[in-house]
Amino acid sequence: TAAPAAIQTPLQRHSYAAGIILSEGIEKSLRLQKSLGLEVDKNALLAGVNDSIAGSRKMDTKQLNENYEALAEKMSEKEKAAYDRGFATLQSTLSGKTVLKQNQSMFFVEKKKGGAAIKNGDKLTVRLTQSRLDGKAVAPQKSFPIVYSDSIPYVLNQAITLAKKGGTVEVYCFASDMYPAEMLPSSLVGFDLLKYTFSVSK
């Protein structure tokens, strides 16, 4: 274990911040492995980080590649299985509901039928609820004004268009459909199932 470092000079602060950011990437990988049911030996992992920085690796390049590729293959298999299970869950959850549009694993579902179609320049208020499929909130409910145009983000554009004025649309999807990998919140993994509810009013 490295000795405690003084964090006083600009160089020390910059270096410390770099270390924290690096560790956040490692923690994200560990959370994914745990969610896939894979065990991790944290002591060995930290030893690998320290040995790499110190230039004293205990494996040659061939051994490193073989072991890392074996882990990556195992993670890939389990992740694919998790996505397959999730897609099946989405399909069973949406059975009997009115699916207005499907884009791969993203489903736009009618909850409340709207009235007039929405046109460019319309001023609207959108109420958004974000939750997991089991109903647990991912973020606080919020309402926001918007001027409708073709340039607003895809999911918002489609939800508003399909909901129409006075309507409500639910969007069911994987977390990875909504977030790029580098922006995924720490509380989520890519194959978590989410539900977004968009209610549109004037």
Predicted features by range, described:
Residues 1-202:
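Cross-family detector of peptidyl-prolyl cis-trans isomerase
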